[in-house]
Amino acid sequence: DVVDAQARRMGRLVTDLRKLADLETAALSLEDVDIAETVHDAAQAVGEEGAARGGGPRIRLDLPQVPWPLSHVRGDGDLLYSAVYNVISNASKYTSPGGTVEVRGREESGTVTIEVADTGIGVPQADLPAVWSELARAGNARGLPGSGLGLALVSTIVRRHGGSVRMASREGVGTRVWLSLPVAGPADTP
């Protein structure tokens, strides 16, 4: 029934708004996080969800192993997983089956950067400045599931960890999202 569906949607929206408000001020549970493992686990979960729905885009991982893997980061492992999962899930949601989502990792100058690139619908240029804002939805995403809070949550999580987020997109071509986090220094590791 339509009323029940709308009530459930509003309940999820309120829950997400509470999460966002809590994230702004809550203390983080800091630990040494293997960000490559986090990315792998999130990509695998999104891939399995796509397969369960009858197919999704190909998800390819390019995480360095030699001469050394990505450094660990210091942070809340559950929150970092949520941020990475959300970006990969968005890329999958807005990319047709048969399309591609590539997840790449690199490390440079004390920063680990995770890039998620897709061949999805892209974000209109006019909508790019607001994508990290609460309740923001690109004009071409209307009618697709989502509350418009996911990227606001991602941005808040990454900023709370001392990092930054960035997006580039071309409508009808695809989107690239970068999550950059400081590596865990020797004083940060247990």
Please report, for each region that a protein language model flagged, where it lies by residue.
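Short beta-strand/loop element within the Bergerat-fold HATPase_c
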Residues: 98-110
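Acidic ATP/Mg2+-coordinating residue in the GHKL
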Residues: 118
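Short helix-loop "hinge" at the ATP-lid/N-box region of the Bergerat-fold HATPase_c
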Residues: 91-92
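Short alpha-helical segment of the dimerization/phosphotransfer core of two-component systems
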Residues: 2-10
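Short conserved segment of the HATPase_c
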Residues: 123-135
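Conserved micro-motifs of the catalytic ATP-binding
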Residues: 24-29, 68-75
